[in-house]
Amino acid sequence: METIYDFVVETNKGVTYKLDAYKGDVMLIVNTASECGFTSQFEGLQSLYEKYKDQGFVILGFPCNQFGGQEPGSGEEAAQNCKLNYGVTFPMHQKIDVKGEHQLPLFRYLTAAQHGFFNEKIKWNFTKFLVDREGNVVKRFAPQKKPVQIEREIEKLL
């Protein structure tokens, strides 16, 4: 049976790795865009990461250009933009598709595990998936849900 730890992803620098690198950690996996109305959420995400990273919490950002063309650059450009404008230090990855024919398998797995209000498909940037220390996808948060609003859910898993 497939688990979240079986998936291979690629960092914004082009390095591939398996998510088993985060076995035992709480993960928040987010599709991001640097020209979106929700882009200011990077500040809140970074605050959560800084507050809880030493307790086994990680945020994984995946730039996506499928919603309004709001991530026009490369994954590396997106990561640089996030670091420069929002101080992002959590792991950022290559630009990916979160739906459709070229959907990253990880996001197929996440959407199957937590269907969300709109059934399976991700409808916009900054959809967030919370994964517990055992690798279970326990919650899906809509883009409108600000990072501060999900902090209690993260704390419960730490």
From Swiss-Prot:
It comes from the Bacteria. The gene is bsaA. Disulfide bonds: none annotated. InterPro entries: Glutathione_peroxidase (IPR000889), GPX_CS (IPR029760), Thioredoxin-like_sf (IPR036249). SUPFAM superfamilies: Thioredoxin-like. GO terms for biological process: cellular response to oxidative stress. The active site is at 36. This is Glutathione peroxidase homolog BsaA. Belongs to the glutathione peroxidase family. One of its GO terms (molecular function) is peroxidase activity. The lineage of its organism: Bacteria, Bacillati, Bacillota, Bacilli, Bacillales. Keywords: Oxidoreductase, Peroxidase.
